[in-house]
């Protein structure tokens, strides 16, 4: 996995900001379980890559950079609460549970918008993002996509799922 990440890092220098590859290697060596998360991201079609550094915490950010929402992470409702409430035709799982199992988080709206400054993602798909508690408490959830050169944020019932909607993950590595 380290070789794949190194190659992707070298091929997409516009994504990394001020993060040097040596910093990524040191951070991964100090947190070896992160390689398991990166492997899961890669195996489900995420194509993880370094997208910079958190300006507050200094953490190195590694995010799914596949052009479309990862194929093996689609047709999922938002969370397990929505999954339990869906009686007819339930999906095979939920985005939040899958992310937790992989050791990553869904992107926030701000993180998703930042990702879109690094390239054009989700031109034919959409991705669940973290829903604020005030929306989730009413049964809703949020997803994003890029169309017409713009990033859009939409709402839907948390129990909804579509073959074109998945989720993107982000992994934070202490620097």
For each feature predicted by the language model, list its residue ranges:
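A binding-site-centric feature that preferentially detects glycan-recognition modules on secreted/surface proteins
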Residues: 1-105, 109-175
């Amino acid at each position: 996995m380290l070789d794949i990440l190194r190659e992707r890092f070298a091929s997409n220098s516009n994504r990394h900001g001020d993060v040097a590859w040596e910093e990524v290697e040191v951070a991964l060596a100090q947190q070896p379980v992160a390689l398991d998360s990166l492997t899961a991201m890669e195996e489900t079609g995420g194509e993880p890559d370094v997208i910079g550094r958190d300006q507050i915490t200094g953490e190195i950010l590694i995010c799914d950079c596949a052009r479309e929402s990862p194929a093996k992470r689609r047709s999922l409702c938002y969370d397990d609460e929505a999954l339990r409430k869906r009686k007819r035709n339930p999906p095979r799982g939920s985005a939040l549970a899958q992310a937790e199992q992989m050791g990553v988080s869904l992107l926030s709206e701000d993180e998703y918008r930042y990702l879109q400054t690094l390239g054009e993602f989700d031109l034919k798909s959409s991705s669940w993002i973290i829903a604020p508690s005030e929306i989730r408490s009413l049964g809703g959830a949020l997803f994003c996509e890029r169309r017409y050169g713009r990033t859009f944020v939409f709402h839907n019932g948390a129990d909804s799922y579509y073959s074109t909607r998945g989720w993107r993950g982000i992994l934070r590595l202490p620097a």
